[in-house]
């Protein structure tokens, strides 16, 4: 009960009175392949080049520098996602992630005679084809606060072009990583912690409701030289959404994932993402990497998603 009250208070103090439900959906589309293959767990996984998005505090662990290019098709190709992730720096790491979301060939219709009612002689016809485009840029910075405690921040900017409307958005996420011991880690990400704004050119604006991500992971080797990463994650929102667990405006969904590395250049991944199963594989050769993830269709029949990426580390 005390934990529930603490979570509610933490979210409430960051929510403005004008917050808009679903305004932050574009920021919820994750980059990367490996974390997606693990059921969308990634707040404690440092092996991904998109780690700065999942939890910017991971950058304080000095991960390898590199670049990743990803292509994803959501809902059996209805929405495309293109992404570039970059981690640079020597002693101090910085991440940059560029995410592009697109829904193309959206057909707009109107009646042949707009002044008359719908009938067999006055049918809808396609008069225009449009597309929806989102361009989102994330940065990530981190520092070590104590021996086992790390803090990170991820500012973000976005440009939205939806049909004949366009707008801009800006905000930031706040991440934390606590190394409980040599094997267990706790990751926290307070997304949109200072009221991310979406400003439309027509004069309207939306405020993104903050949400809280919590993840607990455990790393071990059941067999010598075969590392295993286990993680469970919870998304906690105050938007009165339908979710796995609901109580008033508070809702929570859950994720779980596993990564097994039988040999140094092969990683096998699987997970559970709310109501879907995920799986994937990561293959590396010297500094080159190739990753693939699959997410099966949900109960809403929105179709499956596939991701593939190539990477280079130095």
Identify the residue ranges that each predicted region occupies.
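Sec-dependent N-terminal signal peptides
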Residues: 4-14
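Subset of outer-membrane beta-barrel
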Residues: 19-314
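Positively charged n-region of N-terminal signal peptides that target proteins for export
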Residues: 1-5, 147
């Amino acid at each position: 009960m005390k934990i529930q009250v603490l979570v509610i208070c933490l979210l409430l103090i960051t929510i403005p009175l004008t917050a808009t439900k679903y305004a932050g959906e574009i920021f919820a589309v994750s980059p990367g392949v490996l974390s997606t293959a693990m059921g969308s767990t990634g707040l404690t996984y440092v092996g991904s080049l998109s780690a700065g998005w999942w939890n910017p505090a991971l950058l304080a662990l000095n991960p390898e520098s590199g670049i990743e290019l990803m292509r994803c098709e959501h809902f059996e190709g209805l929405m495309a996602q293109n992404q570039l992730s970059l981690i640079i720096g020597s002693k101090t790491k910085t991440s940059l992630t560029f995410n592009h979301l697109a829904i193309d060939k959206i057909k707009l219709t109107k009646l042949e005679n707009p002044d008359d009612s719908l009938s067999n002689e006055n049918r809808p016809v396609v008069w225009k084809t449009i597309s929806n485009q989102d361009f989102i840029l994330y940065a990530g910075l981190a520092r070590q606060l104590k021996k086992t405690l790390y803090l990170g921040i991820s500012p973000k900017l976005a440009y939205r072009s939806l049909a004949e409307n366009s707008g801009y958005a800006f905000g930031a996420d706040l991440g934390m990583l606590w190394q409980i011991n040599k094997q267990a880690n706790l990751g926290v990400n307070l997304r949109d912690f200072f009221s991310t704004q979406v400003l439309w050119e027509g004069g309207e604006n939306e405020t993104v409701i903050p949400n809280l991500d919590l993840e607990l992971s455990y790393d071990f080797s059941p067999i010598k030289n075969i590392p295993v990463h286990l993680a469970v994650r919870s998304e906690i929102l105050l938007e009165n959404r339908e979710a796995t667990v609901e109580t008033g405006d508070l809702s929570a969904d859950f994720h779980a994932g596993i990564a097994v590395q039988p040999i140094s250049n092969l990683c096998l991944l699987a997970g559970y993402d709310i109501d879907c199963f995920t799986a994937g594989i990561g293959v590396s050769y010297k500094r080159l990497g190739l990753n693939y993830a699959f997410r099966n269709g949900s109960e809403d029949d929105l179709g499956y998603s596939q991701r593939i990426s190539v990477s280079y580390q130095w």
